């Protein structure tokens, strides 16, 4: 089985920035990967298209996926509002790692983050389910609009997304 690839076309205040593609590790975390894949295609009638990265901390990560409230308090999975941590096989080994944001154990919804550094203190707490395949330079460009408290200086959105 080949792991799926999805893409995000990123915009800054409505202006195109570029494309980021992700390999989703369906071979290790099938349920978590399928959630992200389906939210990227929008095939369930809801998903990431048009949503923003509400929290960007340079040298740490870019967080998005709250397509219901757009501020980090919302979002939902394809399995219902929340789903359990699938496993912690994969680790936060460095830049480009794609992992689930949560509010504690077994609270996965749709929020995710892209690491821009090694974040080993998150191992065993957040489910890693993918990695940047192409476009890490776009993620690095997104970082420039972040701040230490995570507030972004411009609106960073997923203008389009889907499966390749």
UniProtKB/Swiss-Prot annotation:
SUPFAM superfamilies: Cyclophilin-like. Glycans are attached at residue 108. The modification N-acetylmethionine is found at residue 1. Catalyzes the cis-trans isomerization of proline imidic peptide bonds in oligopeptides. Exerts a strong chemotactic effect on leukocytes partly through activation of one of its membrane receptors BSG/CD147, initiating a signaling cascade that culminates in MAPK/ERK activation. Activates endothelial cells (ECs) in a proinflammatory manner by stimulating activation of NF-kappa-B and ERK, JNK and p38 MAP-kinases and by inducing expression of adhesion molecules including SELE and VCAM1. The keyword Isomerase applies. GO terms for biological process: activation of protein kinase B activity; apoptotic process; cell adhesion molecule production; cellular response to oxidative stress; endothelial cell activation; leukocyte chemotaxis; negative regulation of oxidative stress-induced intrinsic apoptotic signaling pathway; negative regulation of protein K48-linked ubiquitination. Signal peptide: none annotated. The modification Phosphoserine is found at residue 77. It comes from Bos taurus (Bovine). There is a cross-link at residues 28, 82 (Glycyl lysine isopeptide (Lys-Gly) (interchain with G-Cter in SUMO2)). There is a cross-link at residue 28 (Glycyl lysine isopeptide (Lys-Gly) (interchain with G-Cter in ubiquitin)). GO terms for cellular component: cytoplasm; cytosol; extracellular region; nucleus. Its EC number is 5.2.1.8. It comes from the Eukaryota. Disulfide bonds join 62-161. Interacts with protein phosphatase PPP3CA/calcineurin A. Interacts with isoform 2 of BSG/CD147. Interacts with FOXO1; the interaction promotes FOXO1 dephosphorylation, nuclear accumulation and transcriptional activity. Interacts with integrin ITGA2B:ITGB3; the interaction is ROS and peptidyl-prolyl cis-trans isomerase (PPIase) activity-dependent and is increased in the presence of thrombin. Interacts with MAP3K5. Binds cyclosporin A (CsA). CsA mediates some of its effects via an inhibitory action on PPIase. Coiled coil: none annotated. This is Peptidyl-prolyl cis-trans isomerase A. The modification Phosphothreonine is found at residue 93. It is found in: Cytoplasm; Secreted; Nucleus. Residues 7-163 form the PPIase cyclophilin-type domain. CDD domains: cyclophilin_ABH_like. GO terms for molecular function: cyclosporin A binding; heparan sulfate binding; integrin binding; peptidyl-prolyl cis-trans isomerase activity.
């Amino acid at each position: 089985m080949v792991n799926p690839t999805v893409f995000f076309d990123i915009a800054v205040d409505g202006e195109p920035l570029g494309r980021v593609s992700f390999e989703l590790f369906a071979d290790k975390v099938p349920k978590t990967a399928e959630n992200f894949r389906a939210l990227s295609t929008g095939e369930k009638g809801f998903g990431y298209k048009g949503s923003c990265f509400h929290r960007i901390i340079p040298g740490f990560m870019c967080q998005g996926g709250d397509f219901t409230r757009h501020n980090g308090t919302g979002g939902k999975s394809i399995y219902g509002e929340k789903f359990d941590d699938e496993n912690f096989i994969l680790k936060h080994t460095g830049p480009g790692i794609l992992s689930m944001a949560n509010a504690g154990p077994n609270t996965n919804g749709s929020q995710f983050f892209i690491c821009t550094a090694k974040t080993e203190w998150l191992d065993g707490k957040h489910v890693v389910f993918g990695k940047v395949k192409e476009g890490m330079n776009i993620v690095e460009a997104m970082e420039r609009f972040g701040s230490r408290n995570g507030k972004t200086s411009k609106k960073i959105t997923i203008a389009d997304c889907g499966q390749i």
